[in-house]
């Protein structure tokens, strides 16, 4: 990051830069004094996060009268979500990543079950975090081929390449002294989204912010899209269409 240190440092304070990280006090929206208890009334399970030094844990328990009839503690390894709206929580066992049944809504300072866990659908600690989810909420990870939710390495936060494309060629050319006056010319060793045609600019954002059902093209994966491509080269995104409804959903 030596070439663009100020830009990088500024970017890391944005929602995308804070999108995914270890669940430590530095990166979590949960504080020592703000750890809301939640209750799944259908399955009669309570969830209470707590800190132990700089590690975050989630306690699941069930009560019958004054007796505790069930108790399970799991360490939270990652927080997902910048904290602008939410922090959700993940744990990892031997590279396999699952979501935990606890989401903190930062603006209202309340906690609840994550979306999809409500109304009796609380899968507790078994929801797998697949590559479609991980590849939008984080930089592209090293995903184990053939696995749903096993990762050989997991980055921390959406990186520069998500909007600017692979940077290896760009770095090599700059280190070799090939400097372009970008006030006059386009530097084709890296993608500047501002210089893309409008439809390709939208495709960079719509890769993750268009809320629909993504269907991959044959032979493609969720990590194949690169800025400057047409999104349709990698996937088609289908949106629900309602009668007399002209709007579509974009994720914030």
Predicted region positions:
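Domain-scale recognition of modular recruitment/scaffold domains used in eukaryotic signaling
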Residues: 95, 106-110
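Residue-level signal for beta-strand positions within conserved beta-sheet cores that form or flank
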Residues: 98
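Primarily the internal scaffold of c-type cytochrome electron-transfer domains
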Residues: 5-82, 88-93, 101, 112-118, ...
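Well-ordered mid-protein domain cores that form the structural environment of catalytic cofactors
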Residues: 109-140
């Amino acid at each position: 990051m030596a070439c663009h240190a100020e830009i990088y440092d500024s970017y890391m304070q944005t929602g995308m830069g804070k999108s995914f990280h270890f669940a430590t006090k530095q990166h979590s929206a949960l504080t020592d004094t703000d750890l809301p208890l939640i209750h799944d009334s259908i399955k009669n399970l309570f969830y209470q996060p707590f800190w132990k030094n700089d590690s975050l844990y989630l306690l699941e328990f069930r009560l019958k009268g004054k007796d505790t009839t069930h108790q399970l503690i799991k360490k939270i390894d990652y927080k997902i979500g910048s904290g602008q709206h939410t922090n959700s929580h993940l744990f990892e066992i031997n590279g396999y990543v699952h979501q935990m049944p606890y989401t903190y809504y930062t603006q209202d300072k309340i906690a609840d079950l994550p979306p999809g866990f409500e109304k009796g659908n609380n899968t507790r600690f078994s929801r797998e975090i697949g590559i479609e989810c991980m590849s939008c909420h984080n930089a592209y990870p090293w995903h184990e081929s053939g696995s749903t939710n096993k990762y050989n390495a997991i980055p921390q936060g959406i990186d520069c390449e998500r909007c600017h494309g692979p940077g290896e060629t760009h770095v090599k050319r700059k280190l070799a002294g090939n400097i372009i006056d970008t006030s006059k010319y386009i530097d084709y060793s890296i993608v500047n989204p501002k210089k893309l045609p409008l439809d390709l600019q939208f495709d960079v954002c719509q890769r993750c912010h268009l809320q629909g059902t993504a269907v991959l093209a044959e032979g493609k994966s969720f990590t194949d899209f690169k800025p400057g491509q047409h999104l349709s080269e990698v996937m088609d995104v289908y949106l629900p269409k309602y009668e007399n409804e002209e709007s579509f959903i974009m994720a914030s």
